[in-house]
């Protein structure tokens, strides 16, 4: 959607919400009123193009420890974030993960300076310097703030058996990986914003033109503006091309799985559009997913494809709630306003506690 566009005061829609109302374009709709016309039951046989989760859905998705829980049943998150160039990304992503209740964070770096910073600011994290392949973790998270000294470690995440959240520079590695003819699988989660998705798609178009043609025909590589205009289309396209789950971050975050299931989550507040916000979200998502996968591993239940999307939606929701709570320092009195990433991370325990108390 490109300007000029008339903005409505109110939009009336029938039977079910239409796709654009689950994207950033809903800002043009004003107050939305849905009239079901008494037919929702008849729609249950159809698969929706997109799902929008409610607060109770988020509550049901959140894993809660019990009297028998210990740190390993709470999940171990391996993190390969930050670098000497971007040490803040490591500190913020790890702090956010720790504040979401994961059993352990194992942080990997060969940098003595970064290790000392981590010990000073996040002493709960456990440090390792060896190869990621020998570490015992439940879920990996990497790419946020990665520099030349850490990208090589991040390459391991592309073929690691564990689920992995691939942010920022790791998305580029994922695009290059497709040149081998391999696919990533739904347990690999790409978390680009529109600019990073543009770069990902351009790389795929260059290194895997056959796959591009098979899935997208003669479609040209979209610009960032194109992706902003059609986020649903391009998140789905990236998932189809890669076989991965794709979280396209924005005012409305679109999460697309390779089986076609797609979720939409409002971003909470536009004040989250700051440096460090994505690093914090990586830590939140990694911590929540590690807890979920640990529980499923204990029960020997299979991990459904939609699990990665649902937990991702929960992460986006908590991120937005913590941002609004950070303005007042009180989750019971949230407001829109400046929300620096470090403040957002501080509010996560209270926001999670309030979700559980509802």
Task: Report the location of each language-model feature.
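Proline/glycine-rich low-complexity loops and linkers
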Residues: 1-3
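Small-residue (G/A/S/T)-rich helix-start motifs and N-terminal tracts that mark the onset
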Residues: 8-11, 16-168, 172-189, 194, ...
